[in-house]
C-alpha cells in the first residue's frame, strides 16, 4: 500500500543473488500500478569476483524487463561500501524530468495519507505524496470518507517550510482544529466536495501471470487503494473463476466506503495467506443498477480512459454533464478533457457536453414517443415537459436541448404552454366520436345547469382521466 502514488521505480537487485521470487512479485506490482519505467541498481558487486556472473545477471534482468514491457532508463552497477557507481546512480535519478508524468493531472488537490502524528506546538501533522493538483497554506480541505472540513496551517516538503505544493511532491501538512484520531493511514485529503464515498465499484481486473491462485466468484480479497487496505468481494460476470494471466471487468463490493478516482490503479492480495495475485484499474464508481443488471452491461466499459470518457458521455446522454463536472469525475486536466472533446467531435451546447449520436438517438426517441402518445390518446395533441421527463427519464436541460433542435428542424412547435408535433392530426376512432357526441349532447341538454365532471364517468361508463381528455 502506497506504491500507487509513485511514477518511477528504482529496482535494486543484489549481484550475488540475482533475480529472486520477490523481484518477480515487485515487478508485477509495478506493472499492475501502471509504473512501466525505472532504473535498475545492481548492488553488492564487490561480493562477486566472477565478472561473467555479473554479465549473466544483467542479461537476465534486461530480458525480464523486456518481457514485462518495462522501460529501462538506466542500468547501474553499485557498491555501497566503496561508493562505486553511487554518484552515477544519483545523476541518473536527478536527470529524470518529472513533468512528463504530471502533465495531465487535474488541478484539484488530492493526497493519500500514509502517516499521521501530533507535534507539540503544532497539532496534527500528516504525510503523503500529492496525487493531484496544487494547494497553498490557508486553503480549506476535506477529509474523506468522513467529509470533515479543515484548513491547512502549514506545509513542509523535504524538511523545509513552503507556501504551496504540487502533484508529485512529498509533503507534511499541518491541519488546524483536527485531532489525530480523525485521520489514519488511508485517509484521503482533497479539495472540498471533490470525491464521493462508495463501497461499490467496477474494476478492470488482471490476474498476475505467475500466480498459482484463482479468483473465484464472491471470493473475499484484500484491496490496496493508495495507502488504504480494505476487504471486499468480487462478482464475476460470466464465469466462476479467473486463472493466471486472465483479465475481465468485474464488480467489487467493499466492506467499507472508500474515496477513489476513476483510473486509480490498485493491487489485490489473497485474504490468507497474503499473496499478491492481481492488479486492476477503477473503471466506474458507485454505478447505477442492480448487480444482475450490472453483470450484463459492465463488460462493454472500455479500459482506455479516453474511450471510457466517450462511452460515459454517450451512455449518460439523458442526464448530460458539463466539461467541469467531467474534469472532476475523471480527475484530469481541463486541457486533456478539451482534447478528448475535439477528438470525439463532442457538441458543447446549453452548458452541457454530448455526442452527435446521443442527439440523433434522442430526437428519434422523442419523435416516436410523440407518435405513440397521439396513438394512445388522440385527444391530447399538446404535451408538456413533465410528461417527457417522467416518461423518458430525461433531465430538464436535456429536454430543453432536444426541443430547441426539433424546433429548428420544424419537427415540433410551441403552442398553448406546451408543444406538439408539426402536422399532427387528431385521428378519432368510431368509439371516440361516439363519446364526444354523447358528451356534447349531455352538455347541451343541461343548458344553464352545472354538471359535475365527477358524474360524467358514471354516465359514459369511462375513466375519470378519459373524461378530462374529452
Which ranges hold each PLM region?
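Conserved nucleotide-binding/hydrolysis micro-motifs of P-loop NTPases
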Residues: 15-20, 35, 44-49, 80-84, ...
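Conserved catalytic-core segments of large NTP-driven translation/proteostasis enzymes
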Residues: 55, 63-211
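Short, intrinsically disordered, charge-balanced linker/junction segments flanking boundaries
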Residues: 1, 257, 467-470
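Conserved Switch II/interswitch segment of TRAFAC-class P-loop GTPases
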Residues: 3-26, 31-55
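Beta-strand/loop-dominated core regions that host nucleotide or nucleotide-derived cofactor-binding catalytic loops
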Residues: 140-307, 400, 421-422, 429
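C-terminal non-catalytic scaffold/interaction domains in large multidomain proteins
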Residues: 286-470
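Residue-level signature of catalytic and energy-coupling elements of molecular machines
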Residues: 10, 30, 43, 61, ...
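G-domain G4 guanine-recognition motif of GTPases
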Residues: 14-15, 39-55, 75-84, 176, ...
Amino acid at each position: 500500500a502506497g506504491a500507487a502514488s509513485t511514477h518511477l521505480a528504482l529496482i535494486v537487485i543484489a549481484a550475488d543473488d540475482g533475480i529472486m521470487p520477490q523481484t518477480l512479485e515487485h515487478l508485477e506490482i509495478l506493472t499492475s500500478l501502471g509504473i512501466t519505467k525505472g532504473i535498475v541498481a545492481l548492488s553488492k558487486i564487490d561480493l562477486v569476483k566472477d565478472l561473467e556472473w555479473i554479465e549473466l545477471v544483467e542479461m537476465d534482468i534486461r530480458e525480464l524487463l523486456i518481457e514485462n514491457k518495462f522501460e529501462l532508463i538506466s542500468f547501474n552497477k553499485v557498491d555501497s561500501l566503496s561508493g562505486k557507481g553511487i554518484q552515477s546512480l544519483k545523476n541518473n535519478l536527478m536527470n529524470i524530468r518529472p513533468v512528463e508524468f504530471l502533465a495531465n493531472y487535474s488541478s484539484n488537490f488530492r493526497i493519500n495519507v500514509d502517516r499521521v502524528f501530533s507535534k507539540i506546538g503544532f497539532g496534527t501533522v500528516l504525510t503523503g505524496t500529492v496525487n493531484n493538483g496544487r494547494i497553498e497554506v490557508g486553503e480549506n480541505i476535506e477529509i474523506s470518507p468522513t467529509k470533515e472540513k479543515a484548513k491547512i496551517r502549514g506545509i513542509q516538503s523535504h524538511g523545509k517550510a513552503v507556501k504551496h505544493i504540487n502533484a508529485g511532491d512529498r509533503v507534511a501538512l499541518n491541519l488546524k482544529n483536527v485531532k489525530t484520531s480523525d485521520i489514519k493511514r488511508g485517509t484521503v485529503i482533497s479539495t472540498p466536495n471533490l470525491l464521493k464515498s462508495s463501497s461499490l465499484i467496477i474494476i478492470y481486473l488482471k490476474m498476475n501471470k505467475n500466480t498459482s491462485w484463482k479468483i473465484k466468484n464472491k471470493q473475499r480479497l484484500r484491496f490496496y487503494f493508495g495507502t488504504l487496505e480494505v476487504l471486499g468481494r468480487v462478482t464475476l460476470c460470466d464465469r466462476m473463476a479467473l486463472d493466471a494471466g486472465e483479465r475481465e471487468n468485474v464488480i467489487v463490493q467493499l466492506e467499507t466506503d472508500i474515496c477513489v478516482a476513476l483510473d486509480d490503479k490498485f493491487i489485490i492480495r489473497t485474504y490468507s495467506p497474503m499473496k499478491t495475485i492481481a492488479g486492476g484499474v477503477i473503471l466506474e464508481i458507485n454505478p447505477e443498477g442492480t448487480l444482475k443488471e450490472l453483470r450484463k452491461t459492465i463488460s462493454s466499459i472500455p479500459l482506455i480512459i479516453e474511450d471510457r470518457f466517450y462511452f460515459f458521455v454517450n451512455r449518460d446522454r439523458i442526464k448530460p454533464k458539463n466539461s467541469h463536472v467531467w474534469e472532476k469525475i475523471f480527475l484530469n486536466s481541463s486541457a486533456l478533457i478539451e482534447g478528448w472533446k475535439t477528438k470525439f467531435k463532442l457538441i458543447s451546447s446549453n452548458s452541457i457536453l454530448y455526442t452527435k449520436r446521443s442527439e440523433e438517438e434522442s430526437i428519434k426517441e422523442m419523435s416516436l414517443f410523440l407518435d405513440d402518445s397521439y396513438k394512445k390518446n388522440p385527444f391530447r395533441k399538446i404535451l408538456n415537459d413533465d410528461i417527457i421527463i417522467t416518461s423518458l427519464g430525461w433531465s430538464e436541460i436535456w429536454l430543453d436541448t432536444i426541443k430547441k433542435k426539433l424546433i429548428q428542424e420544424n419537427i415540433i412547435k410551441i403552442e398553448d404552454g406546451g408543444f406538439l408535433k408539426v402536422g399532427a392530426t387528431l385521428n378519432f376512432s368510431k368509439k371516440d366520436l361516439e363519446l364526444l357526441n354523447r358528451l356534447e349532447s349531455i352538455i347541451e341538454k343541461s343548458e344553464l345547469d352545472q354538471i359535475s365532471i365527477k358524474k360524467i364517468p358514471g354516465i359514459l361508463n369511462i375513466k375519470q382521466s378519459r373524461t378530462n381528455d374529452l
